[in-house]
């Protein structure tokens, strides 16, 4: 009976995946506009999708290889093999204040206040006492400079960069705002930022034994979109939140796929005169 239920669940997931991949292959959704596979964002339903990251153990097993009548013990072995054990702690840091009048990204360096903010954020992260595993930062100048300053307080933490975390317009916001953008902007940026979510935000690998503490240093739009997606809230709501420069948001992903938000845009560790939102 357990196996039969698993096969049904697996079949539903496979059918949904096949439908999406099929639509992507022909470049169009049924009766709709062009479809980019990375832009397919599940609609918020009010029900928690346990397999939101496609890493639920049952979806990691090739059910067609399991004997439908006698394979329950074999299935359980496979499920145990793919069951995560560790919790992932993910800190999302918005870059510090920068010179917005720069003509190119290279010119948009941190302001003196921005450097102070990054220093305060680095001290705050260090004071939390976590054993951080990795820092990943956006390749944009303001994020790179923020990372350099924060890293002074976390000298032994390895660092790497990712273009996926660059700033952009993830999805047309609701309610709509006055600074209109053409559809192609969301079409291009949205695919990349959705890819960033799928790449960085998921439950731990089954091989991971200990809890991990990871830092992503990037941009307000990226962080707000990731938070909406991680909590399975309508992603169009991303612009309803404000994040101060150098602020800390904190997601926790449990082995069973449950996600909680412990901080959103925390900048209470900064003196009031050091806070900005550029």
Swiss-Prot record:
Q: Which GO terms describe its molecular function?
A: protein serine/threonine phosphatase activity
Q: What is its EC number?
A: 3.1.3.16
Reaction(s) catalysed by this chain's protein: O-phospho-L-seryl-[protein] + H2O = L-seryl-[protein] + phosphate; O-phospho-L-threonyl-[protein] + H2O = L-threonyl-[protein] + phosphate
Please report the record's description of how this protein sits within the membrane: Single-pass membrane protein
Post-translationally, this protein is described as follows, namely: Phosphorylated by the RIPK1/RIPK3 complex under necrotic conditions. This phosphorylation increases PGAM5 phosphatase activity.
Q: Which InterPro entries match?
A: His_Pase_superF_clade-1, His_PPase_superfam, Mito_Ser/Thr_phosphatase
Pfam families documented for this protein: His_Phos_1
The cysteines covalently paired via disulfide bonds are none
Q: Which residues cross the membrane?
A: 7-27
Signal peptide range:
none
Question: What's this protein's function?
Answer: Displays phosphatase activity for serine/threonine residues. Has apparently no phosphoglycerate mutase activity. May be regulator of mitochondrial dynamics. May be a central mediator for programmed necrosis.
Free-text comment on this protein's domains from its UniProt entry: The N-terminal 35 amino acids, including the potential transmembrane alpha-helix, function as a non-cleaved mitochondrial targeting sequence that targets the protein to the cytosolic side of the outer mitochondrial membrane.
Protein name, as recorded: Serine/threonine-protein phosphatase PGAM5, mitochondrial
The lineage, from the top, is: Eukaryota, Metazoa, Chordata, Craniata, Vertebrata
């Amino acid at each position: 009976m357990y196996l039969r239920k698993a096969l049904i669940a697996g079949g539903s997931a496979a059918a949904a995946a096949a439908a999406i991949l099929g639509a992507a292959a022909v470049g169009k959704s049924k009766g709709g506009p062009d479809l980019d596979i990375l832009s397919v964002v599940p609609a918020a339903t009010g029900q928690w999708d346990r397999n939101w990251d496609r890493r639920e153990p049952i979806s990691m097993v090739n059910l067609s290889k399991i004997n439908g009548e006698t394979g329950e013990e074999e299935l359980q072995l496979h499920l145990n093999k793919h069951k995560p054990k560790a919790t992932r702690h993910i800190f999302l840091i918005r870059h510090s204040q920068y010179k917005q009048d720069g003509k190119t990204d290279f010119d948009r360096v941190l302001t003196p206040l921005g450097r102070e903010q990054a220093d305060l954020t680095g001290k705050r992260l260090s004071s939390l006492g976590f054993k951080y595993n990795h820092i990943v930062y956006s390749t944009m100048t303001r994020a790179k400079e923020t990372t350099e300053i924060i890293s002074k307080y976390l000298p032994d933490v390895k660092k790497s960069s990712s273009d996926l975390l660059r700033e952009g317009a993830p999805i047309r916001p609701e309610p709509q705002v006055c600074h209109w953008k053409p559809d192609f902007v969301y079409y291009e940026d949205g695919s990349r930022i959705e890819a960033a979510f799928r790449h960085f935000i998921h439950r731990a690998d089954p091989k991971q034994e200990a809890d991990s503490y990871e830092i992503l240093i990037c941009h307000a739009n990226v962080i707000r979109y990731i938070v909406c997606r991680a909590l399975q809230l309508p992603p169009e709501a991303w612009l309803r939140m404000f994040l101060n420069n150098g602020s800390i948001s904190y997601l926790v992903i449990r082995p069973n796929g449950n996600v909680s938000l412990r901080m959103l845009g925390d900048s209470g560790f900064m003196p009031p005169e050091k806070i900005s939102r550029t």
